[in-house]
């Protein structure tokens, strides 16, 4: 048995979702494709696929083996491309995890550019606000806020986000406005929780040298910031938000800055990937692309006060 051929056939079967489609893609009889996978299972001594008359699914062992096969086959492709042409052609799957707000408002709108540059990279983008373990979760690189805690990883700085507070015009009219941070505890507050510990987001505001902590209350909490913003626009209360994410709503009159001279501490955002001399070409291409994307988009660095001044909504100081 040619192990590399068997591994490549197994990966093709999983990608295609059936032996028939894999056989068509490979230009082989279905029986030969099925036999290759069976021989591989016999060689390994484990079942890789659950087979039914209607569908195929990976076993637990099969899932782990599939991930390793992909990495190995992609490394072989890159090595051969380097030897043939001097420069490795980025090819294969790339698994990226990102903060939800960054994924929605910064990365997704520009993915057509990444696809045009690297048409052979198959990007799988997941978005969440929990802390990912790259190795355990099978992720190639991640975009995260806050300080880097794992010294085995490399973090490249992308930007600093300074969040502010926002509310719908209708809600502000109903409460008569907000004149100082002391007023915030009287009104409905929307926030979110994230991370493995599901800790709530703390309202710790600053304005120059001044600091103010809004005491926790009974406001609603969400596990996605964008959902909280949607509730905010519907008049449910006052909500934190990244200026670049809410700028369109502010300019359209759907949201109004609240105390724009007060803001949350600037949070650094990094693209993080394993520290390895053998970093794949795919990861290197994505890291360079995303750093270029952030550098060319000044609105990502927009501050609450700048957005309010731009919109003519910075009356309350």
Swiss-Prot record:
PROSITE patterns: HTH_LYSR. The keyword Transcription regulation applies. InterPro entries: LysR_subst-bd, Tscrpt_reg_HTH_LysR, WH-like_DNA-bd_sf, WH_DNA-bd_sf. GO terms for biological process: DNA-templated transcription. Residues 19-38 bind DNA. The keyword Transcription applies. Disruption phenotype: Inactivation of this gene produces a 3.4-fold increase in the expression of fldP in cells untreated by H(2)O(2). Residues 1-59 form the HTH lysR-type domain. Represses the transcription of the operon that consists of PA14_22510 to PA14_22540. This is HTH-type transcriptional repressor PA14_22550. It comes from Pseudomonas aeruginosa (strain UCBPP-PA14).
